[in-house]
Amino acid sequence: MLLKELSSLASPLSQPQVEKLKQLTAELNAVQLAWVSGYLAATANAPGNLAQLAPVSDAQAAQTVTILYGSQTGNGRGIAKALAEKAKAQGYSVNLASMGEYNVRQLKQETLLLLVVSTHGEGEAPDDAIELHKFLASKRAPQLSNLHYSVLALGDSSYEFFCQTGKDFDARLSALGAKALLPLVECDVDYEAAAGQWHADVLTAVKPLIQTTANVVALNDTSSALAASESEFTKQNPYSAEVLVSQKITGRGSDRDVRHVEIDLGESGLCYEVGDALGVWFSNNETLVDEILAGLGLAADTKVTVGNESISLKQALLEKKELTQLYPGLVKAWAELSASPELLALSGDKEQVRQFILHHQFADLVANYQLKADANLDANKLVELLRPLTPRLYSIASSQSEVDTEVHLTVALVEDEHQGQARFGGASHFLASAEEGAEVKVYVEPNKHFRLPEDPQTPVIMIGPGTGVAPFRAFMQERVAQGAEGDSWLFFGNPHFEQDFLYQTEWQQYLKNGDLTRIDVAFSRDQAHKIYVQHRIKEQGQTLWQWLQNGAHLYICGDAERMAKDVHQALLAIAVEFGGLSSEAAEEYFETLRSHKRYQKDVY
């Protein structure tokens, strides 16, 4: 078989391994290829490797539990790793892998498959899961009558397509003849309890199907290697860092408050790569908590139980409970507690609930929808009603090659006004209000799907309006440290040039030094007709298409709801106009770029 024809479907290699092999061999001459061929043949025929290549018996295969995860953040991976550890402790052989590293040709050999998968954007599969998701939906997918499976779906009920990817996997596996060990488990953002219960239930369901032995060795289990590379500080055990700077970087006349935040990681040993995110735990605003307590007529010092702790109600609302983000279940529960005709009517319409959630907080429910006389909502019932506080993720705006033990963020203060009452985002207000020396609990959330090219000579195109420019500041710091000679192109947009040009002097310095090849900006409200980044992209379509033909990697960061979609449509239009592609071929072209890691998005 010619190497150019090689694919993961025609070999025992995964698609990422195929791409690495193609990249390596493309750089070798005939003599070098011959030497590598001999080396690989000798390695493969070594006694130890021959033993590893021996076929697995049916009995051995039947005793292996394959656990696959697909998640845009680390939540799915964490759940899968914890399940793998519990399964190994019970004597099961475990194959733990990311869906992105899994060879789909192996699927028809599986007998026990446990999936943990999140949903990204509007019902889309996360990057890790795309290839497996597509394979199962294709005509190439095999019948799976020998397979038992279970799916844990992660999602956010405030979005329309809640847990859609998990639903897709469950439906497709069933259609292919696989047998469900358990009904599909759908988890909201407060997934910990449901995931823990699934661990227990699925291992109980697996037990009658396989034999265990105390001496079983886990096969292809990468969880130990993963754990070794991770810091001791995690989402569950964050590092108490110090805020060094929280500086407004929009002008006095701007209607947006955007902060440049610098945080000292000190002696934590926390490391990050450009493209990663920082998880930030925060406390709710005390004024907001006092307003809620007064509105409900509850005493701040009333003792409540949260988990295994007995704390005051006020402390629970400050530190443990989500107050600034509503979710459908809470709106529906409050409709029943208040018996409000408006809320009751609204709660039956998913789209109306979604719109309501976007513009209201829990304090608005308390203020505007009074509880009915027999609601009987005491302090403990209140904390049970509210879901746990969750950290917020911010794209990191710095490279450790330049800032060492610091980490920088670009934070837009989320603020709104409802019936004359100011409302702020929980984490953004916490960071915007933080004074020098304040403590903030943080952890690094890796994002391997938003990485610079391995070769610093590769051109990059960066599209980041608003705070979406944050990771590209990190990209530029890293490329300067690398001495990268590849061209770089930034598209940036915001309302006004004078008020909202984030990091303007830094971009100008990069241009002057030749580190940034070009920048195109769109300031939407500086002229009568609004101009956005997608318009600039279309204007530069011929040049941008040429960059892509020359191997450029394309990155988008920022708003998923509108910007990323509009930019994608602009890119498709360029492929049609300047590449001569049909609409279908243009979609396929960018899908190919994505699968080759040349089209990456960090959208939210």
UniProtKB/Swiss-Prot annotation:
Domain named Flavodoxin-like: residues: 65-203
Cofactor: FAD; FMN
Enzyme nomenclature, EC number: 1.8.1.2
Domain of life, per lineage: Bacteria
Keywords recorded for this protein, A-Z: Amino-acid biosynthesis, Cysteine biosynthesis, Electron transport, FAD, Flavoprotein, FMN, NADP, Oxidoreductase, Transport
Signal peptide per UniProt: none
Domain (FAD-binding FR-type) ranges: 236-453
Binding-site residues, NADP(+): 524-525, 530-534, 566
Comment on bound cofactor: Binds 1 FAD per subunit.
Binding annotation for FAD: 324, 358, 392-395, 410-412, 425-428, 604
Database matches in SUPFAM superfamilies: Ferredoxin reductase-like, C-terminal NADP-linked domain, Flavoproteins, Riboflavin synthase domain-like
GO biological process: cysteine biosynthetic process; hydrogen sulfide biosynthetic process; sulfate assimilation
GO cellular component: cytosol
GO MF annotations, alphabetized: flavin adenine dinucleotide binding; FMN binding; sulfite reductase (NADPH) activity
Record's catalysed reaction(s): hydrogen sulfide + 3 NADP(+) + 3 H2O = sulfite + 3 NADPH + 4 H(+)
Pathway recorded for this protein: Sulfur metabolism; hydrogen sulfide biosynthesis; hydrogen sulfide from sulfite (NADPH route): step 1/1
Binding site for FMN: 71-76, 118-121, 154-163
UniProt keyword Amino-acid biosynthesis present: yes
InterPro entries reported for this sequence: CysJ, CysJ-like_FAD-binding, CysJ_Proteobact, FAD-bd_FR_type, Flavdoxin-like, Flavodoxin/NO_synth, Flavoprot_Pyr_Nucl_cyt_Rdtase, Flavoprotein-like_sf
Family membership: Belongs to the NADPH-dependent sulphite reductase flavoprotein subunit CysJ family.
Oligomeric and partner information: Alpha(8)-beta(8). The alpha component is a flavoprotein, the beta component is a hemoprotein.
Role of this protein: Component of the sulfite reductase complex that catalyzes the 6-electron reduction of sulfite to sulfide. This is one of several activities required for the biosynthesis of L-cysteine from sulfate. The flavoprotein component catalyzes the electron flow from NADPH -> FAD -> FMN to the hemoprotein component.
NCBIfam families: cysJ
Name recorded for this polypeptide: Sulfite reductase [NADPH] flavoprotein alpha-component
Native organism: Shewanella sp. (strain MR-7)
Gene that this sequence comes from: cysJ
